[in-house]
């Protein structure tokens, strides 16, 4: 019970920070900006690359495109989602362009990351309902609109549903089966003689293609997404 109370209190504080975030001064340096972006970040690939992108952004006065993707595989948000929302809010306040990507196409495949078994496929209707629930929560804290200072909402079905074999097959040569089997989620299932779907092998390629389609400068995600984000 005490653990649940602490969790609820933490979520309450996160929401308060989202509604009333700390003020960011106007004349912020690149190093200070990088520090804000990397606050509470476990890993970054690479810090020097981020610094170079921030420097170029400041010189050209062109905001970075920051991608945060989420597959609507459930009906609600968990604690980790609110942590990312807080970070995205800070980055938006720094003046960068947030793209909140809804994986309405990939949700029907299922991300295998950190899973001991294949996900149950969702229907299009389930995905659409989950999408509505997600956006109703996110839009309370993140400002959306066509204004460059506001976040944009994107759906990966817009390009992935049009991706034909002629374009997709060359992408498959960038990964090997041995690389995929090095992932914990796959190696455990392979050793336990549990099924691994070919569609699950293809998932990281689709996530990587999302970043290309959005021309993202930076992608934010959980540690379980590291392999997918580096593809």
Predicted regions and their residues:
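Short amphipathic alpha-helical segments, especially helix-boundary/capping motifs
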Residues: 24-28, 61-65, 111-112, 179-180, ...
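Short charge-dense sequence patches
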Residues: 27-40, 75-90, 150-158, 178-188
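Divalent-metal (Mg2+/Mn2+/Ca2+)-assisted nucleotide/phosphate chemistry catalytic cores
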Residues: 41, 121-131, 135-231
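Short, well-ordered alpha-helical scaffold segments within catalytic/effector domains
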Residues: 47, 51, 85, 199-202, ...
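Active-site rim/loop-helix segments in enzyme catalytic domains that contact anionic ligands
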Residues: 89, 100-138
């Amino acid at each position: 019970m005490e653990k649940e109370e602490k969790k609820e209190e933490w979520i309450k504080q996160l929401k308060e920070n989202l509604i009333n975030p700390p003020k960011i001064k106007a004349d912020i340096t690149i190093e200070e900006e990088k520090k804000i972006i990397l606050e509470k970040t476990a890993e970054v690939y690479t810090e020097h690359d981020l610094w170079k992108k921030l420097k170029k952004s400041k010189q050209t006065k062109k905001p970075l495109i920051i991608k945060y993707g989420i597959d609507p595989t459930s009906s609600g948000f968990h604690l980790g989602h609110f942590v990312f929302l807080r970070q995205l809010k800070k980055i938006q306040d720094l003046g960068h362009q947030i793209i909140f990507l809804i994986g309405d196409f990939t949700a029907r495949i299922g991300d295998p990351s950190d899973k001991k078994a294949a996900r149950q496929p969702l229907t299009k209707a389930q995905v659409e309902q989950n999408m509505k629930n997600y956006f109703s929560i996110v839009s309370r804290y993140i400002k959306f609109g066509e204004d460059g200072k506001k976040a944009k909402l994107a759906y990966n079905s817009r390009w992935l549903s049009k991706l034909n074999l002629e374009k997709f097959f060359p992408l498959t040569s960038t990964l090997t089966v041995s690389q995929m089997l090095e992932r914990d989620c796959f190696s455990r299932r392979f050793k336990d003689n549990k099924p691994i779907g070919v569609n699950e092998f293809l998932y990281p390629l689709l996530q990587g293609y999302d970043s290309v389609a959005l021309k993202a400068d930076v992608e934010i995600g959980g540690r379980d997404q590291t392999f997918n984000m580096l593809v």
